[in-house]
Amino acid sequence: INLTDKCLSCHKDGKIPHKNYKGEEELITGYQNSVHYKALKDGNFDAPTCYQCHGAHEMESTDNPDSKISKKNIANTCGQSGCHTSQLTDYKGSIHEIGVGKDNKDAPTCNNCHGNHGIVTKNVENKLEKSRDIVTLCSNCHSSVELVERNDLPTQVSETFSESFH
């Protein structure tokens, strides 16, 4: 936890050592309110820290294919040892992973649906507001005329969701 707090102490104000131009304060407070940070504070030292996902000072842009948080690598980062291994297994070979592998910018990976830093527990009372209902989430893409046409997506995701593996 000391390492995570150390990262947060420098990055919180967005001035030292550099500003995150996507909204530093939101990223920090999102992580501090996340299930990951709570688990860390509660003594689960396997919970993800800044360092585990981003590395220390060797951080690379999400545009760099070698980055741990690039679109092609984020699922492996989330599924690294002790973390979301069963979810990674489900994702591997899925239509979404195949799309990401083909550099389809529309294809989602973990953080497109679950977010980056403000990840909430599945037991949060107001989960719908925090992480959006899964059917609605899927429908955001699968009901978009532009995305459906561009990617030849099935349009009846909401109707068939409960009949699928979910």
Question: What name fits each language-model region?
Answer:
Residues 1-166:
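Short sequence/structural segments immediately N-terminal
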